[in-house]
Amino acid sequence: MNENSPPAPKSTDLPLPPVVDKSQSLQGSRAIGRLGESAKITAIIAIMCVAFWVVKNKLVKANVTWAVVQEGISNVPYWQIGIACGLTALNYLILTGYDWIAVRHLKKELPMTKIMTGAIVGYSYGNVLGWLLGGNAVRYRLYSSWGFSFLEIVAFVSILATTFWLGLFLLAGVAFIALPIKLPEEVSEKLIFDHHVWGLLFLGCIGLYLAACTIFRKPIRVRDFEVTLPPFSLSTMQLVVSAGDFLLASQVLFWLLPSSQSAEINFSTVLIAYLTGQIITVLTHVPGGFGVLEGVLVSFFPEESLGDVLAAVVLFRIIYYFLPFIPATILLIYNEIRAKRRPKDAVQDI
């Protein structure tokens, strides 16, 4: 080698960058996702088991057997069952307002028949199977076949959730402040504050939301997302529709109580118990609130009336949950058949 030639480059001891196997990374993320879903399902089952355990202990303590519940069912007059069925039909018409508000806020045009189909199917499946397993899944199926994008459906479901909480807060606020409520001691102790304070807090949240809808007319940017609040007229419709929904649903439950118990158990207590059950059901994602609603109701009412209360819940689940599930399933199957025969329906912006 020539002495004047430049020295050969020295080898380095630095390690080479690791080779990332994208397939393994993807498999790992999927495994984590499956683990998370399994944990979620396990938690839901555990909550249901705890709820049923609470109900069972209450019933054993009150000496309530299935024969007592059957007797309570037989004591409900047919005319009260007829009223409950009529209120259920009216309630499901009111539920259409949830989807109508969401469609209007997204500035989309969709035939009223499809809006009604989406609402009836979505809420029927949500009531029986839960929102994660039923309601949101069938809504995605329906609205995607009608031309809604994934992000539009996400926004759609967010509007439905907002409307739900607005009506719940409004009714709970009014009930806590203005209505004669008889809360059991074990429930009152867990409220931390007096129920009148909770009523003011709930109504305060409603006032802040309406004020925000009036003031912020331009989209609010949150990181990479833009949130557009509905106009005041549409936000008041959210309150009317959701409050009407909860009032009618709790009226269905109230009318299924035997006549002898209706005088002892006032509607305002039934309303608060039903709203409490709805809150816990939504937060825990228990399908249909099975066990949760029963657990709340047996905690709100005296032991001597538990047989009649459980009888009312059994009838309520049949009339309000399972009967609408039949036409909802027929509508879903009909929509699936139509979707396979023709391309996706176009949805127009207003």
Placement of each model-derived feature along the sequence:
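Predominantly cytoplasmic-facing regulatory/coupling regions of multi-pass membrane proteins
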Residues: 2-120, 178-282, 304-306, 310-311, ...
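Hydrophobic alpha-helical membrane segments of integral membrane proteins
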Residues: 40, 142, 154-157, 161-162, ...
